[in-house]
Amino acid sequence: MMSLKKEIDAARHKAQRLEVQTASGMQVWHVWNASAGKPMVLLHGGSGSWNHWVRNVLPLSEARAVWALDTPGLGDSELPIGAEDADDLSVPLAQGLEALFKAEPVDMVGFSFGGLMAGFLAAQQSSLIKRMVLVGVPGLGLSNNIPNMRGFRVGMTSEERMAIHRNNLLAIMVHDENNISPDLLKMQEHNVLRDRLRRRRIARSDVLLSLQNQWKCEVHGIWGEKDALYEGSLHLLPELLAGCQLMNFDIIEGAGHWVQFEAADAFNHILLARLPIE
C-alpha cells in the first residue's frame, strides 16, 4: 500500500496550485482536471487544508473538475481581517468563487467546518451553489461533546505533540486507530500549526437548522456510521434537515467523522453518484 506521504505527493504533483487575490486576502486553491466542466468545490474541515481530501481528489478528478480550497485562515490561505469563525468566511469564500468562476454556480462539498461555511454561503448567496453535499457537519444542535480532546502546551517535545495529535485524531476524526500513521501525524501537525481561526463556537450551535430554510439548492448528506460527533443520534439527522431539499442521506459503515479518508472508495463512489455531470 502506498504511504500517505506518497499519496499527498502524488495528489500535489498532479494539481495546479493557484494563488487567487481577493479583497479579503490571498486564497490558495488546488485544481485537478480543470477543463472537465462544472466545478466540484471541496471545503475541508477545521484545522485542516486541501489534504483532508487527499484520497478523493484524484479519483474524483477522473470524472469531474475538482477544486480544493485552503480555507481563509487555514492552510496556506491568508486570514481575512477580523475573521474568527465560519460565519465570517462567507464573503471571502464568495469572493474566491466569483474570481474563479464568475457567476457560474458550482457543486459544493463541505466537510465538517467546511460544511458550516457552505451552509452560510447557501443561505446568503444562494446563486453561487447548484448542489451541496454536507459531510459530517456540526451546527445541527446534536453534536456530542468530545471530553478526551487534549491541548498543547508551550515547550512540548515533538514526541509529546505527536502523542496529542494521535489522541485527538482518534477522539474525533478517525474511528479505526490502524488508520493513524506517522505520516498522518506529520500532516496533522503541519495543518494545526497553520490554523489561525481560533473560535469554534458555531460548531456547537444549531445554526444550520435555521439557515436550511434559505437554501435554494438540492442537498445531499454523507456521514460515517461511527462519527464521534453523532454517536447515538445519527438517525435523527434526516428529520432535522427536513427544511431543505434533502435528496439523499448516505451513511458509510464503519467510518468515523473523517469519512472521506477512512472509507475513500465508498465515499468517492457515492459522491459521484450524487453529483453526476449535468
Regions found by a protein language model. Give the residues of each.
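Alpha/beta-hydrolase fold catalytic core
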Residues: 1-40, 61-64, 101-102, 170-171, ...
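Conserved HGGG/HGGXW glycine-rich cap/lid loop of the alpha/beta-hydrolase fold
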Residues: 32-76
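Active-site loop/oxyanion-hole signature of alpha/beta-hydrolase fold enzymes
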Residues: 54, 67-109, 269
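Gly/Ala-rich beta-loop-alpha elbow adjacent to hydrolase catalytic centers
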Residues: 110, 114, 118
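Flexible "cap/lid" loop of the alpha/beta hydrolase fold
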Residues: 119-123, 130-160
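Conserved alpha/beta-hydrolase catalytic His-Asp/Glu region
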Residues: 144, 159-217
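Conserved loop-alpha-helix segment in the C-terminal half of the alpha/beta-hydrolase fold
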Residues: 223-255
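Catalytic histidine-centered segment of alpha/beta-hydrolase-like enzymes
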Residues: 255-264, 268
